[in-house]
């Protein structure tokens, strides 16, 4: 670049720096504006195709979900009053309606020792054997001589944690006595907790040995400090299904009706059974159909925005979508719409309109909820046949979309091409900057040379004038 001392025209009087800057800017501006437009348009298209690809992928996800046969094989179970029981079902359950009456809930064992005086300590060491059920091998816990009731409790809980039995102290503020209370883990008849103390620790006993050598348990008499026994006895749940009397060791019943699990909550009113209903999971299918419609409508909305021209006022230029005139986008929607009106192989439900899904003027889908509910209730298998399988609607729609979203597909090729264009803009801008810099250097040199030439001409002119003035006979005019 020319030396800065030569930028202003000393001899010519010209502002060379400003002249060169103006000429360079005039040369650069059109190309720079062209590159900016190209970069802006390309970036908008790149973003638009990314949005389109995302919308298509979302739609494909729900298409694949609706094409899964297991979606239509699912079963749902419900009860007429969840205050008394709740129910769930697997695909193995057969549709049906059952009457359930609950007369007794399953319960875990809760037992208590006789009362211990305030400040009690064991007089001798020994062992306590705790069993859950008379036939249980039990857990033996060592108790040291002089142990407080709290220390005995802590030793018990440390040894019983794997068995799930817990020991707590309940104090009587009236007389200062305390009892050890044991709570079992497992519900069901025969799961009562028994405690047997070795010699010197018999006051911890809960349950007695009968004449046959078996343990028996009596109910605790809360008014007697010497009484031990059960507060709550371990019991089976008792209930009936359609009049058949049944029992379960837990309140979770899963082997009475194939594929159905129900959770008993409380005893039902006498002679007022509740209803358990097992049916196809119509709610789950409907939710997925709604997701399909939402995803399709999102795709329509995205394409409309990207390909539309929106007026914003008489005095303003319209808003033009990034993909206006893009044939691939138009072809995508046209292909989808054509596929959706092709009849399926079924007889009752052959297309979306048969189940209450129709196309609005703007190209989006809408659902007639009442019609859809009725079709799902009366023609569930026909809906499954329309949607699923290699020739089902969901697979056909997915096949139309795959060429656009697959690796190396239509949209990926477009994105790659646009990325190349963005890179080329950067390359062209670098080349333009180099040309402009070269032009600026050249113009500065040319204008500097011109200014120097003018200086030389001025000097020559001055010398000639001086020489002429000194010639003989030359008379100067006054």
Curated annotation (Swiss-Prot):
Query: Which Gene Ontology CC terms are recorded?
Result: bacterial-type flagellum filament cap; bacterial-type flagellum hook; extracellular region
Q: Which InterPro entries match?
A: Flagellin_hook_IN_motif (IPR010810), FliD (IPR040026), FliD_C (IPR010809), FliD_N (IPR003481)
Q: Where in the cell is it found?
A: Secreted; Bacterial flagellum
Record keywords, A-Z: Bacterial flagellum, Coiled coil, Secreted
Gene Ontology BP, a term: cell adhesion
Q: Does the keyword Secreted apply?
A: yes
Q: Is Cell wall biogenesis/degradation among the key words of this record?
A: no
**Domain of life of the native organism:** Bacteria
Q: What is the effect of changing residue 235 to R?
A: In strain: PA103
* Chief location category: secreted
> Which intervals of the chain form a coiled coil?
409-460
Q: How does it assemble?
A: Homopentamer.
Q: What does this protein do, in the record's words?
A: Required for the morphogenesis and for the elongation of the flagellar filament by facilitating polymerization of the flagellin monomers at the tip of growing filament. Forms a capping structure, which prevents flagellin subunits (transported through the central channel of the flagellum) from leaking out without polymerization at the distal end. Essential for motility. Responsible for adhesion to mucin, which is the initial event in colonization by this organism of the airways of cystic fibrosis patients.
Annotated family: Belongs to the FliD family.
Q: What is this protein called?
A: A-type flagellar hook-associated protein 2
**Species in which this protein is naturally found:** Pseudomonas aeruginosa
